[in-house]
Amino acid sequence: MLANLFGKNGLNGSTASLSDSDSGSSSQYNSKPSSQYGSPTSINFKDDTSSILRPISGNILDHMSDDLKSKLFATKDLISDISLAYYDPKSTNSNINISPDSFRLLLTEETGQMVCRNNYRVVLDYVTPKGSYIEQIRPSELKEYIFGSPVRSSDSLEVDKIRVIPNSNILIISRTFHVSSKINRLAICLCLPSYYLPVVMEAWRQVSTWLDNTQASIISIISRLKKPPSTLHLQCDKELSCLLPADARFQFVSEFESIILALQRKIVPCLRSISEIPRLFLYPTTLMKFVELWFKDVFNWMELKDGPRMNFLSTLLAIIIVNFKEELKSSESTRIAIMSGNMVVSNKLINIISGILEPKYKGPLLHTDEDNELSTKLEQLDSIDTVNTSSTEIHMIKKTNSNSSISVSPASTKYQNSNKGWEIPRRRSAHSVASISSGESLAEVIQPSSLKSGSNSLHQLYASLSNNYGTSYGSWFNKRPNISQFMQYSSPSNSNESWDRAASIHRTNSGNSIQQLRAGFGITPQQSPSISEYDEYPWFGTPNSPHVENSATATTSNTTVSSASVPWTTKSITEPNRMYNVHIERDFQRISQTELLDDAFDKICKPGRKLECGLTVTPGNMIHAGVLEIEILNQDCVEKSSELLPRYTSYLRNYNSWFKLQAFPANNESESKVITSMKKDLSVYSYSKALLISLSTRDIKEVTIKKEYKNNTQDTNSFKLIQKTARMFHNGKPQANLSLELNNCILLIESTLKRASELLKPIQSSADTSTAMTQEARQEELLKLFKSIIYFKDTKT
């Protein structure tokens, strides 16, 4: 076997590489043995220290509008604990120049002496990438953290330790164990960047499983090397009864390779994913603003994606409520995967789905004053227009010696000022513009020469199509509008002068961009869709375009264009359809509860503050000091939200098996990736379940995989996997084999949505208020309707 691994020459200067299909990387083994025990191991995987990976979620948030960020994450300023300084290879501070993929693995063993300064030796020391800061810590220092006191311990208990080395930003995870006898202790030590500390316990099942497998491999190696008792006794003086030889890493290359590959391809990616991917915030059901927006998002989806006859969304919500809601909350092997080529549409569906999932946040929400924020924004807008008009103008019309600007009608009561998402870039010397499609991460489009005009700032706009309204059209739209369809809405008297730059509207692989024409409505631009996303993206000016609901007015110096006369839907900026008045202090994984702790402490200990709960004082005695017992099981402390958010996330560029709700690009291997991860779950769990949603084909599948043991035994080597796939929605209609409970839930959702649409009509239109319900009664009934949906299984008889 060794000859096959290292070639015909065995260990004499030859190398061998093994590839893995999952990562596409190769591993090499250097045959030259180490001269001392403390040096790194001979196993040397290919490391490219120059290509340090960027944060996983970097582009996800950059391409997301402020409105969508507020709905998904309850904040616009989502900040990770992992600073970008960690990823800067040019950083001079060695304490922070640690790649997120860096780790160090040590396998150490005691030498059998009771009291000795060097009563251990290093059997394996593997570091990646080479030359990182983790490698600079001496093994003798790590030994102090692993074994502790130099006095040998006769305790045979298995001990797991987690600690951070002071002033080093390095986290140590170690396991100390004995084999069969109490001769020597062995230790597995894993060194990681310290910013993984908050997520280690969340991923402890995966880490503990890797430690168990590593320990089993070491015990297997020792059992294969075990000598007869007489031979072991004769070598005690020379070998000091060591269980592992010094060259064990050369004798058992495949075993040590599997240990390192499992660490490199499972544990480190798991920790990195959990720490770097932002998680959704589940709004409480008591927040009326969220309930209204949730219903509006549902109606937008059903009108623009499902159509009048397709009940795709109601069926999907019913399946999640009946079959997945409780399991997602309690099981780590249940997931919902949305496969789509469009990031914006997928995130809007995730926003709808997250509204019915648990566990919801039960703590207090920090609100900002809407009126003050509105007045501040309007004052800022007025001051910008008066002080520096040229900085806010968007030249839609080319006119000599004239600054034609677009202004928002003063009748507006709200103005969305976005500073995230796609923004107008700064003026550059090169007038080419990069248009990024949702299917292409960095696709630069060479613009025509007509854009290279310094007198017009139109070339500064990104070619994009805003999907900020929660609208998205289905595949039944037959054609995309051309430029002539937009030119017909301009004034005839100004056609020669006002639209002479119409040819300079950006052209991308998705067709003509109309974002320039909508720039005056305060909408955050989004990326333009590619040709492959045509069936999932809204195209305006088509026969089935929805009616215009509002009449926001855009005014130029020569003509006034009303939103009622343009071929696209323009929601008035007066409509309260934003979550900007809610802000949560949080990072990527958890909610900050500092204010809750401070408030609880003030209630108990602040002088002069009335205590709202009972207390009991136990006087001190010779045994203990005085004790103050406080009854905290009151209304303020019951059912508080946990700090850690569930592993639900938004659209990702690649499928991530450690998140239970996500969307990712659709391709030929999308379903196989999910099923493969489900099978891997069965190494820890006995049951795995997934809901596969394809937006391009409008298919919903429920896949379950479970273990079935042979002969009714729990032997891990005598079981088979049973996979069942149920098609729940296909060809635009639910399947006939749905359960009675599912059908009842679908009917409930449809009737509830019908009633909710009637309640929301007075809010969306200027109907007669004499017969309309009061605002309080309407909100109360909307809240009851929403709770009847999400608590269907709890209230059904």
UniProtKB/Swiss-Prot annotation:
Q: Name one GO molecular function term.
A: GTPase activator activity
Its keywords, alphabetically, are: Amino-acid transport, Protein transport, Transport
Question: Which InterPro entries does its entry note?
Answer: DENN_FNIP1/2, LST4_longin
Bias (Low complexity) occurs at 16-35
Choose any GO biological process term that the UniProt entry carries and state it: protein transport
Q: Where is the cDENN FNIP1/2-type domain?
A: 293-683
Reply yes or no: does the keyword Zinc apply.
no
Which stretches make up the dDENN FNIP1/2-type domain?
A: 690-767
Q: Which family does it belong to?
A: Belongs to the LST4 family.
Name the UniProt record assigns to this protein: Protein LST4
Per the UniProt record, the source organism is: Vanderwaltozyma polyspora (strain ATCC 22028 / DSM 70294 / BCRC 21397 / CBS 2163 / NBRC 10782 / NRRL Y-8283 / UCD 57-17)
* Gene behind this protein: LST4
